[in-house]
Amino acid sequence: MTDEQIYASALTRIPGIGNIALCNLIKQVGSATAIFQHRKELSQLVPGVSDKLIKALDCPEAFKRAEEELVFAEKNQIKCLTFNDKDYPDRLRECDDAPIVLYYRGNTELNSLRVISIVGTRHATPYGLDLCNAFIRQLSEICPDVLIISGLAYGIDIQAHRTALQYNFPTVGVLAHGLDRIYPSAHRKTAISMMDNGGLLTEFMSGTNPDKQNFVKRNRIVAGMCDAAIVVESAAKGGALITAELAGSYHKDCFAFPGKVMDMYSAGCNELIKNNKASLIMNAEDFVQAMGWDYQTKAKTGNVQRELFPELSAEEKLIIEVLEKNTEGMQINNLVVACNIPISQMSGILFELEMKGVIRAMAGGIYRLLL
């Protein structure tokens, strides 16, 4: 263990000092070591620093706990990444409230060329799980050099990790507790596999419980580490939306998949898109093009893209088949005749298909297939 690791870990144990204040101190003074070594001169080095903060730095208990944690880390192949460490995530370091210490167990480079965060509801539907799987599979075909970040939670998070491993993407799980446990325990097997192609990351020392407030802190790391955050499926309220909001505040790109307007677990995504807080994507090619990333091959059209929307009704499939044969598009009255669907039903079906990103309403009341 190094002096900087000890001092930085100790800083996180000082009561009453938040991440923004800690980041600001390190940026102005240079390092955690310098903060303690020049404690008596801090008021001159950092204008506005309070006497209360300076006094709080005299905390032997913090050093004792820091040394215990670093011994635990060394015994368990855990890296302690301080704020100025070359292996600390560069994208995260740019955030005002970045953690000054991260504990990491894994084998992948956290400063990969391309990093995305995939998040969503814990109560994922078959639609959301299929979306997540299809997106990552398509990404593997056109842009395989990506690090995938998520939170190891139930639902979309664990689906993202497992599918990433399936298609040989490195994937990192950001935890809301220490590295002495895996929560939820049902994901232990996946977490172990991730340490061979990715890893587990946290700002919390061992012994920290996965308390509610820690998940919000965890979400800022998920948002801060990435180039872009992708919300696959979310209710009107939830952690995925918090992550999306944080990503926006960090000036990250944010994307969301649309869903049916009446579906509870698509309400959050639809709201993000409606309020221009996330860009609508239908597939991996949409995403890669929006990011301006080079990609190897064109994603297959037609059936492959349509797999992102597996829950099509018989009427929706019929409309798609008709529009495939009429590439210039068709007016609603012509679709009613061709599909033998009453106009009272046709309007609602076309709206659902447009929300899914399958068709688009053009000038003159013409509907055209986008796939």
Regions from the language model: what does each represent?
Residues T2, T82-L371:
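Glycine-biased, small-residue-rich flexible motifs in mid-sequence functional cores and linkers
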Residues M1-I142:
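Short, positively charged patches
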